[in-house]
Amino acid sequence: MYRRFAAALLSALLLSPGWLGMTGFTQLIGFVPLLWISSSYEGGRRNWWRMFGWAALTFVLWNAMTIWWIWNATPVGPVAATLASTTLNMIAFMLFHTVSKKGPKALAYTLLVAGWIATEYWYTVGEFSW
């Protein structure tokens, strides 16, 4: 459990600097700890929910680290932005996790990339104003 917590935290820490204007290089390996957590679970409903929890923790931490500045405008803003961004991230990642347990790995990774690009596109062209 502590290894998974450390991996979720490490993943969030590696993904954050690119959005904070520091460096984007850490994003290249930012998903590796989260993918390790996913690979450590077998298929099944209980394990799906466990992975959901670790992924949600990772994405909530990542989003909280990158959109904290919205607090300057309104206290409700960062909470709403974190929930909305986390939901979009979770759609793509949990689709990957589900397919990786039931189908070919190549299809799962293709869906992760395609799903992530689709949710980022939706996020970019949507009416999100943060």
Q: Residues of each region from the PLM?
A:
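Membrane-embedded alpha-helical bundles of multi-pass enzymes
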Residues: M1-W130
